[in-house]
């Protein structure tokens, strides 16, 4: 049982005075009346029955009815939080890589940032500085090509908001990559 389901069970049990597994109108009204924060217990009881009573049984509320409504709300809230986090990540991605602020991330914009990243530096001491620089350029270009091949669906060497969004949605573990 999840934490949310345990909380639902606890609240339900506090309403279910006769312990029959259902909430009668009287049980709900009694509980609403005993809460000093509720100014109109009759309206609150009616509202609760209107909101949670999903079957033809208008006399009682089952824990299953309440659980279904609350869990569907929780799922919706989780989806909203996930979408907000995803939008924030897309915004951060564009802020980092869309260096000319034209609304798309080009291959060249990403490549130029990769070239500044020390993670792409070649550390082979036997290579000359020029050879190390060429190796770094090859590695940065290869990484950009690989990323663009996965994300750039229309193959125009530009990443749109939608392309970035769809990729990050499928790959939530994605790290924004090299530091600036």
Swiss-Prot record:
GO biological process, alphabetically ordered: aggregation involved in sorocarp development
InterPro entries hit by this protein: EF-hand-dom_pair (IPR011992), EF_Hand_1_Ca_BS (IPR018247), EF_hand_dom (IPR002048)
One Pfam family recorded for the sequence: EF-hand_5
Keyword Signal set for record: no
Binding positions (Ca(2+) 1): 16, 18, 20, 22, 27
Binding site for Ca(2+) 2: 98, 100, 102, 109
Chain sites annotated for binding Ca(2+) 3: 152, 154, 156, 158, 163
Protein name: Calcium-binding protein E
